[in-house]
């Protein structure tokens, strides 16, 4: 995980002590310069702090066709993007579909929890 994200999460101790995020839904996403650039391990290292907060972790559903046939980013742990070695690649269509699906799922869960 990026040091900036780690620093941000390290600042949430007061939220943890108060249980402020317990039961709240969360998801993670990332990007890397290459297809084997550590996307899955990055997503997985972002999850433990969320578990410690008692958050509900949401991933991507394997029934989403784009997850099965993407040639760029995307894992069951969360949406991802392969930016290329020069970090100049735009999101692929599959990546866009997966990002939208993840955001939609997060929104749907939030609505159900608020009902």
Predicted regions and their residues:
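Helix-loop-strand module that forms the ligand-binding subsite of alpha/beta enzymes
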Residues: 1-68
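Glycine-rich phosphate/pyrophosphate-binding loop and the adjoining helix
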Residues: 59-115
């Amino acid at each position: 995980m990026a040091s900036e994200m780690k620093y941000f999460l390290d600042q949430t101790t007061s939220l943890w002590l108060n249980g402020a995020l317990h039961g709240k839904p969360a998801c993670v996403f990332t990007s890397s310069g290459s297809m084997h650039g550590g996307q899955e391990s990055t997503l997985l290292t972002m999850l433990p702090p969320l578990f410690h907060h008692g958050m509900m972790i949401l991933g991507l559903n394997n029934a989403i066709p784009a997850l099965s046939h993407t040639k760029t980013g995307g894992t069951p742990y969360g949406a991802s993007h392969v930016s290329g070695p020069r970090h100049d690649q735009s999101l692929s269509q599959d990546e866009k579909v997966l990002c939208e699906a993840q955001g939609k799922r997060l929104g749907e869960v939030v609505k159900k929890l608020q009902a």
